[in-house]
């Protein structure tokens, strides 16, 4: 007997946004319905909100096209941000010295489930 799949997942890897800032936005949508989550993200004035919205729309598209789930009844069951690789750069400073700059990246994952 085959089990009915009720969830779909989407991941964006090595996204050029800080995990700490992305977590603030992802906490807003966890547990919400997809329609609510999209409206929250549209009106959140944050760079990572646009990226998270794309990942959410990708998860919804995966649910619809790959698993034939009903889009109206989808809920954001899991949403988390992990730390990606850090790009290390140097900023020139006075007297020939340099300061390190860490350009952080994130791995963003969103899982949607049918109610």
Swiss-Prot record:
Protein's job: This protein binds specifically to 23S rRNA; its binding is stimulated by other ribosomal proteins, e.g. L4, L17, and L20. It is important during the early stages of 50S assembly. It makes multiple contacts with different domains of the 23S rRNA in the assembled 50S subunit and ribosome. The globular domain of the protein is located near the polypeptide exit tunnel on the outside of the subunit, while an extended beta-hairpin is found that lines the wall of the exit tunnel in the center of the 70S ribosome.
Q: Which organism is it from?
A: Enterococcus faecalis (strain ATCC 700802 / V583)
Please report a single Pfam family linked to this protein. Answer: Ribosomal_L22
**Gene Ontology biological process:** translation
GO CC annotation: what is one?
A: cytosolic large ribosomal subunit
Key words of the record? Ribonucleoprotein, Ribosomal protein, RNA-binding, rRNA-binding
Subunit note: Part of the 50S ribosomal subunit.
* Annotated family: Belongs to the universal ribosomal protein uL22 family.
Record's protein name: Large ribosomal subunit protein uL22
Q: Which NCBIfam families match?
A: rplV_bact
One GO molecular function term of this record is: rRNA binding
